[in-house]
Amino acid sequence: MGRFIFVSFGLLVVFLSLSGSEAGFCCPSHWSSYDRYCYKVFKQEMTWADAEKFCTQQHTGSHLVSFHSTEEVDFVVKMTHQSLKSTFFWIGANNIWNKCNWQWSDGTKPEYKEWHEEFECLISRTFDNQWLSAPCSDTYSFVCKFEA
């Protein structure tokens, strides 16, 4: 009997640890989830700095969206294409603090650089994810992201 309880307890521990790994995260209401992250499209237009500040106020660890895989890009492009009437939206890549060093507003580095560096902030097209630099003082819709 003791062995049965021990084995049953062991299986319960394994089940609980596995169920909490990837499937255990959830996003707040009106946020979409993808690969342990939560995303939300905001239709109101703001400058890059105001949009980043707004994102940080939405949830702990939230910033303008950063991209780290083509699958993530596809997920966000689909979201923005469906919900935004505008063609462009802010993304978190910028070189505001260091002209020679592009980074995402969450502090991570872009894995690739496929844009012309005319301005310090980046926008993405809603239908094909082409990145373009834009004056940070322009106003666009935006997407916020945080790790669940």
UniProtKB/Swiss-Prot annotation:
Annotated signal sequence range: 1-23
Hydrolase as UniProt keyword: no
Tissues/organs with expression: Expressed by the venom gland.
Disulfide bond is among the record's keywords: yes
Gene Ontology cellular component terms for the protein in this record: extracellular region
Predominant place of localization: secreted
Origin superkingdom: Eukaryota
Disulfide linkage: 27-38, 55-144, 121-136
Keywords: Disulfide bond, Hemostasis impairing toxin, Platelet aggregation activating toxin, Secreted, Signal, Toxin
Note from the entry: Negative results: does not act by binding to GPIb.
Subunit annotation: Tetramer of heterodimers of alpha and beta subunits (alphabeta)(4); disulfide-linked.
Protein name: Snaclec convulxin subunit beta
